[in-house]
Amino acid sequence: CLLADPELTPESSRRFIATVIAHELSHQWFGNLVTMQWWNDLWLNESFANMMEYVAIDALQPDWHMWEDFATNEVTAALRRDSLDGVQSVQADVNHPDEISTLFDPAIVYAKGGRLLVMVRKLIGEEAFRAGLKSYFEKFAYKNTVGNDLWQELELASGQPIVNLMNTWISQPGLPVVSVSNSHDAAILSQERFFIGEHQPSDALWPIPLFANQPLDVKILNQKETTVYIEKPLQLNCGLSAHFVTKYNESTREYLLKNITELPTLDKICILQDATILARAGFENSASLLPLALSLKTETNEKVFGMAAGALTELRKFVDDNDAARDSLKKISGEFARATFEELGWDEKDGESDDDRERRTTALSLMMYSEDKEVLNEAKTRFDNNKLEDLPTEIRALIISANVRHFETPEMIENLFAAYKNTPSNDLQNDIAIGLTSTKNPKTAEKILANIKDSNIIRPQDASRWFVYLIRTRESRQIAWNWLRENWAWVEGTFGEDKSYDDFIRYAATALLTPNELDDFRQFFEPMENIPALSRTIKLGITEISARVELIGRDKADVLSALQTTL
């Protein structure tokens, strides 16, 4: 739904609606006025539209801080997907009609492609970027183009070697990690392809804009290794402007973490993102995320506070089968959020900022995860004494979830399904879906899965949303995974001709985390690898689950020890 009620639509939904409208309007230029010649240059349409969502809405609503949203949403998605061996490049060949649907990978042709355009915009400057686009549209109006046509216009406008630089980035899959080794007045920089999980050897190199915190004699790292002279501890990718991960040596890392509260917001997000994904890849121990997150518990910027909370959430996979350790993580999560929640309370105050509204949601989510009795009882009171439509929209999903999770009754479930079916509000429907899929009750999970196949209750286009919410809930993960395999013929019959056909596979791969689940995934989906629309998603799914299983085996003991020590 692209209609917003000023009184009822939550801030997050208003932002989403605005970006969707901006995305589609931008296709008047990127897609209609100038159109890609063939599907391999789909990014000329979608990567640009992705970037323009944020350019346009940031200009219209600067108080929304859209580039912080870009950093936490698009950049995070691009980093995680692009770190898997076998991922497609932004510009990808199409050898079979059924492969066209696979090009629409939201993390690559949308998020990564958009990020690469942000990178070149920052590299050449706004004036040259605008001039290059103006020339591109005038020269190719009502014509078909290839990627090189755009890069040539940007190169002419900027006087920089954009063609060679950007062709490497869009044609080469994956991303680099830049390792920084500092001495007193110099730093050795080296690059290699960044992987999470099993991978083939790679000698890939990128021309990497460094965007450093000080002038360097090398602005673009083109080679495997180089030395630069520095005046102070070196920080790279300032403003989160380029598509790479930075691994600092211990002394520089300690310096940045010690001073993280003094950094600009996007730099804080960059450090948190790098720390999280480096831990996933085994460059750092996942236990290091705990003190990093706790150091930011008084952060007032919602995106940074949310990223720190996300670092704590990363640790949940390590306590999946350990009740005592899970209780420890719950207590730590509650303590992380307590001061912020006590500051903001349950109810919005006059003149409250968007940041405070979003911080309240994040803090309340962690307080509920911690099973704070006072918070859960207040959630029950508010649920019992209000119509769903009257609950505050920013925290309504949390209130419903807390009640389903801790105070579920058969009548409650029936009433929520009835409300879902009868409400005209897409926002309320989504909040109910989040709430119902938080259940601990296997029978409720089974009822949800049965209703997914009933289009009179859940529309087919919403089916994967219910599924992903359910499979990411610890108590229902196995139930949802069994259902997917048992009902694959229905998935195939319902979505086989749609570009969302592989969504169920991709969502399952984000949640499965045990060796047995990995074996089951392989056994069930590997025979389908000859289906063009599914092949890449299946292979990437195996890599993703394998990496998660390996990560848990490698870091679990250290994470459990860190949890115990922190308490």
Please name every model-derived segment:
Residues 75-76, 80, 112-113, 183, ...:
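Long, ordered, helix-rich scaffold segments
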Residues 207-212:
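Short polybasic amphipathic segments
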